[in-house]
């Protein structure tokens, strides 16, 4: 397993993009319409993979109460099925996995920690890079 990225809810996407660009991040791509809101993916120069996901949901979004701060962080898992069995054995409930692309290889789910923080679990399809990269957002 490895940490993939941290998601942050932001009140003003343009302002936040300006800030993170000034810090040194580069915009890798955007996913404008998701249940979470508009997503902007950022990475540092020299890194191959996304490290920060800015989440902008002006009306609060379907998944969040409209405040700013941590949205979630994501962990890559080798096997979603094995991970879910392991979590269940430890008394940790997970949402039913979904597949963003409709395949059986690319699966995601969420668990909630004791303080209410969301952790996204991601199983990449075979051959996918070890993180989100520019290839995930063709221009």
Name each model feature, range by range:
Residues 2-12, 30, 40-44, 62-139, ...:
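Vicinal oxygen chelate
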Residues 59-63, 127-130:
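A short local loop/turn or secondary-structure capping micro-motif enriched for an aromatic residue
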Residues 45-47, 55-57, 124:
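Generic beta-structure capping elements
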Residues 2, 9-49:
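Core segments of cupin and vicinal oxygen chelate
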Residues 47-51, 116-119:
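Short, charged/polar, Gly/Pro-enriched secondary-structure boundary elements
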